[in-house]
Amino acid sequence: MKAPMTLELVWEHDLVLKGRSGDAGIVLDSAGQAGPSPVQALAFALAGCMAMDVVHILRKGRLDLRGLKIDLTAERAPEDPHRITAVAIAFTVTGEIPKDQIQRAIDLSHEKYCSVWHSMRQDISFTTTFSVGTGS
């Protein structure tokens, strides 16, 4: 079993909070100015989790990964608590990688490995797309 995760979150002013977990820190700001809002941080966490999985899977397969970019769009409910109701993630992968290997890496992240996705409500609509470039 993995060790429990611990963190500390301290209110600074207005709706700005500073958090720390081990050596890592974050500033959360409801207005999204001093740092991401909590919901933006959740979206960053999801995109980051999937990106790390995809990079790890493609590298483990010794594929020619040269770059990865994610664009995430999250739709939110109009009523409180304005939860995320749909997520669309577009992956842009740079390198000479077969499309089926990219799709496999994305699917493995979504279906098996991404702990952030598996911690979210599973009734959220979820779609992914990808494009490949050979870029510099």
Which residues does each PLM region occupy?
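Alpha-helical metal-binding/catalytic segments enriched in His/Glu/Asp
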Residues: 49-50
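Extended beta-strand/beta-hairpin segments
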Residues: 1-45, 54-136
